[in-house]
Amino acid sequence: MWASIFGGKGNTNKELPKKAIIELREHINLLSKKQAHLQGQITAQENEARKFLTRGNKTMAKNALKKKKVYEGQLVKLESQMDSLEQQLFSIESANLNLETMRAMKQGAKAMKSIHSGLDIDRVDETMDEIREQVELGEEISDAISRPLYTGANEIDEDELDEELDMLAQETEPQVATKEQALPESKQALSMPNIPNTKIDESKTKIEEEEEDEDERALRELQAEMGL
């Protein structure tokens, strides 16, 4: 009945170490309280013996010391029990820790086995080869897509272009020379660079001076006619 409630025999065995650890700790705590009580009784009986001695009552002092000895004997046995329980608790805790560690490692091994169950070195190598092939295929496709379209017939030869350009230049030079010869002299003169001519400037100055003298002469004649 209890096995069915707690999950069977395996689950019960799994809970035994924890239950034992709990019970041992509880009993050690109980003995610790008993130890403190005995130590208090020993101190109290010793104080009683001192008190009776100061009063001169050796009989009562002796009885107090006897009780003290009894408590001391009980304390020795109790402390021995506590030592045994603590050693047992330490051993069970260590064993339980080892058990839990082994269970965890077993679960890890089972998980790794499950993961590797569908794998072997041949399959891994085969898969890696397939991946490499697909990567290479992808690179080839990328290179093919990146190449320019309409190559071959429409490809331009740079050397041929240079030769054609030289021929056009040779044909154009005589035509330019003929056009320059056919231009009127006035246009040719305009096309020539301006050269400063000092003689032309001097004659222009003389003409301007003569025009100024004529203006002054006409002005004087007008003044004379007006009687000014």
From Swiss-Prot:
Biased segments, Basic and acidic residues type: 217-228
Single GO molecular function = identical protein binding
Gene Ontology annotations of biological process type: ATP export; intralumenal vesicle formation; peroxisome organization; protein transport to vacuole involved in ubiquitin-dependent protein catabolic process via the multivesicular body sorting pathway; reticulophagy
Highest taxon of the lineage: Eukaryota
- Where does this protein have compositionally biased stretches of type Polar residues? 188-197
Specify where the region named Disordered lies, as residue ranges: 171-228
Please give the coiled-coil regions recorded for this protein: none
Topology relative to the lipid bilayer, per the entry, is: Peripheral membrane protein
One Gene Ontology cellular component term attached to this UniProt record is: cytoplasmic side of plasma membrane
**Record keywords, A-Z:** Cytoplasm, Endosome, Membrane
Q: Tell where it localizes.
A: Cytoplasm; Endosome membrane
- One Pfam annotation reads Snf7
Could you tell me what this protein does? Answer: Required for the sorting and concentration of proteins resulting in the entry of these proteins into the invaginating vesicles of the multivesicular body (MVB). Also required for the proteolytic cleavage of the transcription factor RIM101 in response to alkaline ambient pH.
What is said about its interaction partners and assembly?
A: A component of the endosomal sorting required for transport complex III (ESCRT-III).
| Annotated family | Belongs to the SNF7 family.
In Swiss-Prot or TrEMBL terms, this protein is called: Vacuolar-sorting protein SNF7
